[in-house]
Amino acid sequence: MGKALFITGTGTDVGKTYVTGLIVRKLRQAGLNGGYYKAALSGAVPDANGELQPGDALYVKHVAEIEEPIRNLVTYVYPEAFSPHLAAEINHRPIDFKRVKKDFERAKSRNDYLTMEGSGGIICPLRWDNQQHMLLDDLVKRLHLGVLIVADAGLGTINGTVLTVEHLRAREIPVRGIIFNKYTPGDIMQDDNASMIEEMTGVKILAYVKKGDTELDIDIDMLKNLYA
């Protein structure tokens, strides 16, 4: 059975999928058996045959040169670009933890280092109906995963990143580190954001990703040690 790491973002559109692709690519280029899994994906676009295409999973599969079929990489796919709980309700396909856990465990059995990507931020609702209330952090906790946070380097990131760290700690979920995305070297505000986040949380920023980067600048042993 392999090791796993969960990737969350401080919100939507912070570049979580982009960074996840770089992480899996880094592992695989180092000769390691690195894989990808996502429980639920919304906003999928149909192809010419009407089949929904899970864009995030397809992107990581392409960037990291993953050979597994796309059906192994994501469990629930919805066309609406909504929060998963709403997309699931509209399509009458509620997210079932038992099915997610089964697919997750299968993915772990196939990969030595499995990177699981979340949906939106850590408090994203996955299911909210008369039978069950399940947020993304519930899923992470029940799967016993540590979390790596992807944060936008720009204005507003101090608040979002510190709140994400504090929420994870309140839920007793291990925080493995932070990756700063959309970083501009020499930008005084972004550098101050990084310093303030590290001082306020005690969590290290492990890598800085610039726009257009095709490689993740992080020591491979450090990256491997984030997985458990």
Show where each model-derived region lies.
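Inter-motif core of Ras-like GTPase G domains
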Residues: 129-153
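Switch II (G3) loop of P-loop NTPases
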Residues: 100, 104-132
